[in-house]
């Protein structure tokens, strides 16, 4: 995670979740202009997209300098991803472990598709810096979250578009507790509280049950990782 020249512009993959909200704050701290990109791909937890407005409003209120840097927000609909994916993230089926130790929430190629679309949009808008919340420390084992995958894709995108894109993954080597700590480092308790209250992680789209770490079913893999990270973050902060 190196600081970038303030004159550069970044495109942040922003779903409305904890990780992408933290990455947005990270980008706003480092770049002169930041735009966001979300994807509506038929996910069960599409409510995450609705959470983005509250997060953006909270961040710009929290830090006026961030408000000056924040630019256009984009949303791309790619329903085909759900149509070709028989997963618990795109179908109303129980979440369980599949073959090879991967949960059936894994959507094959999702991050590859997201980053390719992001690069195409960045190309059109004259950007070369793309920020994503991929992580292979506290994660569900998804192969498209791994550092070697992201580096390989960066090479492919640069060759395929004849550009010098840089794919930033500031959370790659952080566990969930460290991700909470990074949010505090970037925006203090105000940002941590904003992410707790308004970001969405739960794969089932549950926002009726409130926990110390935020809203969710508390049982899906995403909720368990978020809850575990929150407890460890609080313990480390004592």
Swiss-Prot record:
Listed name of the protein: 7-cyano-7-deazaguanine synthase
Catalytic activity of the protein: 7-carboxy-7-deazaguanine + NH4(+) + ATP = 7-cyano-7-deazaguanine + ADP + phosphate + H2O + H(+)
Annotated function: Catalyzes the ATP-dependent conversion of 7-carboxy-7-deazaguanine (CDG) to 7-cyano-7-deazaguanine (preQ(0)).
Family the entry assigns: Belongs to the QueC family.
GO BP, sorted A to Z: queuosine biosynthetic process
Cofactor note: Binds 1 zinc ion per subunit.
CDD domains noted in UniProt: QueC-like (cd01995)
Gene this chain is encoded by: queC
Cofactor list: Zn(2+)
Pathway recorded for this protein: Purine metabolism; 7-cyano-7-deazaguanine biosynthesis
The keyword NADP is assigned to this record: no
Known EC number: 6.3.4.20
Gene3D superfamilies to which the protein is assigned, alphabetical: HUPs (3.40.50.620)
Species this chain originates from: Nitrobacter hamburgensis (strain DSM 10229 / NCIMB 13809 / X14)
Pfam families: QueC (PF06508)
Keywords: ATP-binding, Ligase, Metal-binding, Nucleotide-binding, Queuosine biosynthesis, Zinc
Residues binding ATP, per UniProt: 14-24
Gene Ontology molecular function terms on file: ATP binding; ligase activity, forming carbon-nitrogen bonds; zinc ion binding
Binding site for Zn(2+): 202, 217, 220, 223
Tree of life domain: Bacteria
